[in-house]
């Protein structure tokens, strides 16, 4: 598409970043609302145990989304580089592979999750008080896993070809359906967590149908035709090489949340509910910064594939400045509204007290968190699988999880609460070091070519 080619190659950097990032940020804002909806309406039941159950189940839902990102982020990176290299048919093979790969893995995940439900419930730290609610919620989410993987994957695939607006519309449609159904199913029909899960899956089905019609009406330069499905020729390897680090990041994040919840359970169900509410509130800050950085990944990938290193660096620097400014503004807003944000979800005195402290703790690293996501998405956009994997493992595996145990042992509940911002700052340092190394290598290669 000529318009998308101009966007990647010629449009001024601020406008190109805005064109790609704003729809993605709106999509992430939609994800924030989407994730808050279940907790908000469950909170209106004034039952902390149901709120805690949904909080405990959230990491499993995030793992399903992470597996969708295996094909979504991996496919988006591979597609944008293929288009930058003018290999259009290769991009078709990639999009078809991602379509059927996401659906196939979704079916496998659904089967294993349903039959392994009791094991999962114990792993996420469900107590005798919350296990019944968590089981009801997760059973429906597990059955709907194929729709979660597909909608997550193709929200990213569309961005890979520059169709950020269409990606946003699909996300928005799914969220609107979820939000409309939540109060009906949770409160009016009195289905509680079961209603929340059903609304979530129906919302995902709506998003899937939108993405399918986008391809079937041939609005895309890509295809999901089965005749272009291909695993060999580096297609699967190219997607998985970037997709695994990207999905591993979210899987480790979910696993870290499980470890965090297990540490909090030692202090009762109330801190678990409070942390769930605090993290939902903090999603506004985190996901808007992720949206900015995910939005520019196709620009990075295309210009890296096209060999335009100067434009790549301009995009990186401009996005870095925007992320810090935006992160600072969002942090100030969160600090000012911290009590209101917690009360919106549930009006329980103990949950509110813990929740306010947790919101404050999570804001300590928020102004600079965008730098971490910028480095991650730049590395993924460049197709650097090993550095991406290293950074991913460092962030959630080697830093956050050990800090939970260490700080819990040293400072008790206070230590658990402040483990996240401490891990964030250490991760930012590692990310900057890795990106600096890659940029220096890129400059050396350019100098060698010129000589």
What are these regions (language model features)?
Residues 1-21, 79-146, 188-244, 300-365, ...:
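Short alpha-helical transmembrane segments in multi-pass integral membrane proteins
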Residues 36-40, 111, 119, 153-157, ...:
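Alpha-helical transmembrane segments of multipass membrane proteins
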Residues 141-159, 167-175, 196-209, 290-293, ...:
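Short runs within selected transmembrane alpha-helices of multi-pass transporters and secretion channels
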Residues 8-40, 44-45, 59-74, 78, ...:
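N-terminal transmembrane alpha-helices
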Residues 19-38, 140, 174, 203-207, ...:
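Transmembrane helical elements of multi-pass membrane transporters/channels
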Residues 30, 34, 64-68, 108, ...:
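Residue-level hotspots within pore-lining transmembrane alpha-helices
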Residues 29, 33-51, 121-128, 184-191, ...:
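Helix-terminus/linker motif at the lipid-water interface of multi-pass membrane proteins
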Residues 51-111, 148-167, 274-332, 336, ...:
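Small-residue-rich hydrophobic transmembrane alpha-helices
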């Amino acid at each position: 598409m000529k318009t998308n080619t101009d966007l990647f190659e010629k449009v001024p950097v601020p406008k190109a970043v805005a064109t790609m990032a704003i729809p993605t940020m709106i999509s992430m804002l939609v994800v924030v609302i989407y994730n808050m909806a279940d907790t908000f309406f469950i909170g209106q039941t004034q039952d902390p145990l149901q709120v805690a159950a949904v909080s405990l189940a959230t990491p499993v839902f995030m793992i399903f989304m992470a597996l969708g990102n295996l094909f979504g982020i991996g496919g988006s990176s591979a597609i944008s580089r293929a288009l930058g290299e003018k290999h259009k048919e290769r991009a078709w093979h990639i999009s078809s592979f991602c379509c059927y790969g996401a659906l196939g893995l979704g079916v496998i995940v659904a089967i294993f999750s349903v039959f392994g439900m009791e094991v999962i419930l114990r792993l996420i730290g469900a107590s005798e008080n919350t296990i019944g609610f968590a089981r009801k919620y997760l059973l429906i989410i597990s059955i709907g896993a194929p729709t979660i993987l597909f909608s997550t994957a193709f929200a990213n695939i569309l961005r890979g070809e520059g169709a950020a607006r269409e990606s946003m519309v699909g996300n928005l449609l799914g969220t609107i359906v979820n939000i409309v159904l939540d109060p009906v199913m949770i409160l009016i029909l009195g289905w509680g967590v079961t209603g929340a899960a059903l609304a979530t899956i129906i919302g995902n089905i709506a998003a899937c149908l939108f993405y399918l019609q986008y391809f079937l009406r041939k609005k895309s330069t890509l295809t999901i035709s089965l005749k272009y499905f291909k695993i060999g020729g580096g297609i699967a390897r190219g997607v998985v090489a970037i997709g695994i680090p990207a999905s591993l990041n979210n899987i480790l994040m979910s696993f870290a949340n499980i470890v965090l919840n297990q540490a909090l359970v030692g202090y009762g169900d109330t801190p678990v509910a409070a942390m769930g509410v605090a993290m939902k509130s903090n999603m506004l800050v985190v996901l808007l910064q992720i949206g900015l950085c995910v939005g520019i990944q196709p620009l990075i990938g295309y210009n890296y594939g096209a060999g335009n290193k100067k434009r790549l660096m301009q995009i990186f620097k401009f996005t870095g400045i925007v992320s810090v400014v935006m992160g600072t503004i969002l942090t100030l807003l969160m600090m000012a509204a911290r009590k209101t944000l917690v009360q919106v979800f549930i009006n329980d005195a103990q949950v509110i007290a813990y929740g306010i402290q947790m919101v404050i703790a999570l804001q300590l690293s928020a102004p600079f968190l965008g730098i971490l996501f910028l480095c991650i998405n730049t590395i993924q956009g460049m197709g650097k699988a090993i550095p991406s994997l290293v950074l991913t493992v460092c962030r959630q595996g080697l830093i956050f999880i050990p800090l939970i145990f260490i700080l819990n042992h040293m400072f008790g509940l206070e230590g658990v609460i402040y483990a996240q911002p401490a891990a964030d700052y250490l991760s930012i340092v590692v990310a900057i070091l890795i990106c600096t190394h890659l940029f220096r290598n890129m400059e050396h290669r350019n100098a060698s070519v010129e000589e």
